[in-house]
A protein has these predicted regions:
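Extracellular adhesion/carbohydrate-binding repeat motifs centered on closely spaced tryptophans
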Residues: 2-133
């Protein structure tokens, strides 16, 4: 009888330990912004990798549809160009890219102007890459 009680206690402890361990592991699932090397990704509350547009109090971010990696620099999305800063925030208005010393202009929806831009009565030609010609 004594051996059976110890065996039952050991099995019960092992089962409870497994349940506790499994619960502990599931609570460690990544949520929110997660850095992986030089890249950032965003995980939903259920732990799934988010892809597409994210709106925060700061503005808009775009997570690549194939990789889920936060976009920076110029990105073509649905045949329109957008400019994201080094923190991934979509920019609007006049943009100076210090790494290339080029200027861009993004409308209020974030799309870069291509072709002629009328800014306060002055006209500027924006190239096909969105940069000032």
């Amino acid at each position: 009888m004594r051996i059976k009680r110890y065996a039952v206690a050991a099995v019960t402890a092992a089962v409870l330990g497994t349940v506790t361990l499994a619960t502990g592991i599931s609570s460690l699932a990544a949520t929110g912004w997660v850095q992986n090397g030089n890249n950032y990704m965003y995980y939903d509350n259920d732990g799934s990798l988010y892809k597409g547009w994210i709106q925060t109090d700061d503005g808009y971010y775009y997570m690549d549809l194939s990789t889920g990696i936060m976009c920076t620099g110029i990105k073509k999305i649905n045949n329109a160009l957008y400019f994201f800063d080094t923190d991934g925030l979509m920019l609007t208005g006049l943009i100076h890219d210090v790494s290339t010393d080029k200027y861009y202009y993004a409308q209020s929806d974030g799309t870069l102007v291509i072709g002629w831009l009328n800014l306060d009565g002055s006209y500027y030609h924006m190239e096909n890459d969105g940069s000032l010609g």
